Amino acid sequence: MTDVTLKALAAERQVSVDRLVQQFADAGIRKSADDSVSAQEKQTLLAHLNREAVSGPDKLTLQRKTRSTLNIPGTGGKSKSVQIEVRKKRIFVKRDPQEAERLAAEEQAQREAEEQARREAEEQAKREAQQKAEREAAEQAKREAAEKAKREAAEKDKVSNQQTDDMTKTAQAEKARRENEAAELKRKAEEEARRKLEEEARRVAEEARRMAEENKWTATPEPVEDTSDYHVTTSQHARQAEDENDREVEGGRGRGRNAKAARPAKKGKHAESKADREEARAAVRGGKGGKRKGSSLQQGFQKPAQAVNRDVVIGETITVGELANKMAVKGSQVIKAMMKLGAMATINQVIDQETAQLVAEEMGHKVILRRENELEEAVMSDRDTGAAAEPRAPVVTIMGHVDHGKTSLLDYIRSTKVASGEAGGITQHIGAYHVETDNGMITFLDTPGHAAFTSMRARGAQATDIVVLVVAADDGVMPQTIEAIQHAKAAGVPVVVAVNKIDKPEADPDRVKNELSQYGILPEEWGGESQFVHVSAKAGTGIDELLDAILLQAEVLELKAVRKGMASGAVIESFLDKGRGPVATVLVREGTLHKGDIVLCGFEYGRVRAMRNELGQEVLEAGPSIPVEILGLSGVPAAGDEVTVVRDEKKAREVALYRQGKFREVKLARQQKSKLENMFANMTEGEVHEVNIVLKADVQGSVEAISDSLLKLSTDEVKVKIIGSGVGGITETDATLAAASNAILVGFNVRADASARKVIESESLDLRYYSVIYNLIDEVKAAMSGMLSPELKQQIIGLAEVRDVFKSPKFGAIAGCMVTEGTIKRHNPIRVLRDNVVIYEGELESLRRFKDDVNEVRNGMECGIGVKNYNDVRVGDMIEVFEIIEIQRTIA
């Protein structure tokens, strides 16, 4: 057998390692968990375990149960039976002979030890008794000797006492005389002290009586009903008797106190202390209790006459209750002040800094605004940015209307086929690329042109230096072209106009110039500042001139940036990759971004684990105006967030968490307030249909664009509600949320995973996949149109003129009519018109032609018409027959 480790042996025997180590120790072998065990040691352990198993005691267990019933007498003469079960258990152990011999030897040794101890105790007691007897005999001899000496001394004293008796009698007489004189002096001193104490007590009593009289007249008079104490009955005679009894008791107390004060004081110090106590009591009570009845309780604290103005420190958000505590006023007063200012709030509602400042200043306090982002400012300022600025490449954003050729133009510049990769041939993300030309490097941002991507275009305009406005020569200025011009003007960015599709026969560049001039984009030949370049992305004409125009504009701008030091930039786009996690496309503005840097990006932070350029190649660093994809963030940042490299990851995490908390607080503080204009909307809120949507997309910008577009579809009757949105595939959580809220699951360029598909199948959820935003918006419009209540329209189908009126015993007045227009149908709603004024609206009850009931009468025929519940039909009236049709409404 080969050696094995103790841990493996424990696993083989299915026992714990500690127990196996203990068994080896019991067998006399010291082992640890990692030691090896030989075959000999295994045999030793096995023999030890067998000995233990053989030598183990045999046990015999006897159990016995007895059951009985006990009758317990209860209330009402009824008895209750209780079942009692007694269980007994005895265990007999059969020991082996060796153990029995060992126990017998131990018992024998114990008995011998007890016998030896008993004998030693008896001998010790005998010795102690003998010693005690000897001590008592010695003491008896001493006592006898002392008594003998005492008798001899008494006989000698008897003789001497007779000689001194005469001298003692004379001394005692002298001593008695001195004691009598001292007693007389002491008695006189006590009488003088008592007389002084009595005079002092009378003076104090007189003073107390006088003060009681003054308080009686100066105290606030109380009502007659309240002068008496508590009564135990409501009878008037009984209450009077109680009052009389109270007065007698009070008078007796007063007399008792006065008598005590007038009694002679006892002798010594006790008399003085007693007199002092009586004097103090008399001063407090004031005679017969007059002062107690006349006094009234008064509050010692005086309320300040004027309000106290405080310095109130207010953060970015604060609750109404906290603001009230800082101003040392009640919360209701703060709420009243807010209502006077036109804002309604509860005591636990969070208000923003501006509102709190207005309320505090309205209540007369001085406000100190506190900045809570000191840590954030410290982290952002602790950066290396002291290097000299160097020229950098321009960042160019290509903007324009959808399908005007923006991506195709950039595609020709980069000599790649990017447009074919976009769904439907339209751009739905910001594409960031940098291109090396003969005259230098240019960074391009390609933005979507669809109407839904307004915020994405606005971000592109803010992050750029130059805007290239692409306008199709055959199409002219379109809505998104105007919007791109507005974004460029808002960002203060120069515009270079690229008139595309110049190779088409219907191209009209002059028309483009005229239309753009209406929006403030004037060509240089007209005295403006914008360069116009005629290009064709398909044929490649004018591309070099466009690049030269861009570089010329960049030279005029003198673009510079710090190349060394810690980088900063902006998030162009972000998405969640299933294999790589959160990925952000970052455009570096200044500094150099290195792999391994700690970045703070909006609400997220992290260390750059990897960087890739637009071609998917790994790079180690990125300088100014270079777009890169970075991995390693804690979450998906929002597009447009600032990216900053910081020194400390712990501080970056604190700042990110602080930003998340403040964003939530500010969002709660700025929620919809209860204003008058919202009350009517809230009243009709229950009548509004809702289309709930859970939206997942591949990138953050698409989520933003689709959410904005869908929310704009809402009407007064049907509202779109985005229950949840995010970046990445559809997960089980999204499916559960959609099932709970009865929502439609929408995936834009993403798919559901296996667990989500199971939930979708089991719950029969509506799951839609899209890759083009047009289709998504159209289908949501169709779903909303199905929720609209149909429109009811009245369509006139016939008109009849009353020529004569007949009387019928069954129907009343019957109008003999001639059908002048359309068809008259039975049981249709009608109107009776007199002089083109509606005088009755009801139902056509009877329609006859030649005494036969018919269902309809056509134009040019005569008929008899009976109007239900109406008899005032006259000759010359017009009867108008109509029907109500439903028209399905659609979302515009």
Swiss-Prot record:
The keyword Oxidoreductase does not apply. GTP binds at residues 400-407, 446-450, 500-503. It comes from the Bacteria. Residues 391-560 form the tr-type G domain. Residues 536-538 are annotated as: G5. Residues 400-407 are annotated as: G1. Residues 500-503 are annotated as: G4. CDD domains: IF2_eIF5B, IF2_mtIF2_II, mtIF2_IVc. Residues 93-304 are annotated as: Disordered. Pfam families: EF-G_D2 (PF22042), GTP_EFTU (PF00009), GTP_EFTU_D2 (PF03144), IF-2 (PF11987), IF2_assoc (PF08364), IF2_N (PF04760). Gene3D superfamilies: P-loop containing nucleotide triphosphate hydrolases, Putative DNA-binding domain, N-terminal subdomain of bacterial translation initiation factor IF2, Translation factors, Translation initiation factor IF- 2, domain 3. Residues 425-429 are annotated as: G2. GO terms for cellular component: cytosol. Keywords: Cytoplasm, GTP-binding, Initiation factor, Nucleotide-binding, Protein biosynthesis. GO terms for molecular function: GTP binding; GTPase activity; guanosine tetraphosphate binding; translation initiation factor activity. Residues 254-269 have a biased composition (Basic residues). The keyword Transmembrane does not apply. It is found in: Cytoplasm. Residues 93-159, 166-216, 270-282 have a biased composition (Basic and acidic residues). Residues 446-449 are annotated as: G3. Belongs to the TRAFAC class translation factor GTPase superfamily. Classic translation factor GTPase family. IF-2 subfamily. One of the essential components for the initiation of protein synthesis. Protects formylmethionyl-tRNA from spontaneous hydrolysis and promotes its binding to the 30S ribosomal subunits. Also involved in the hydrolysis of GTP during the formation of the 70S ribosomal complex. This is Translation initiation factor IF-2. It comes from Salmonella gallinarum (strain 287/91 / NCTC 13346). The gene is infB.
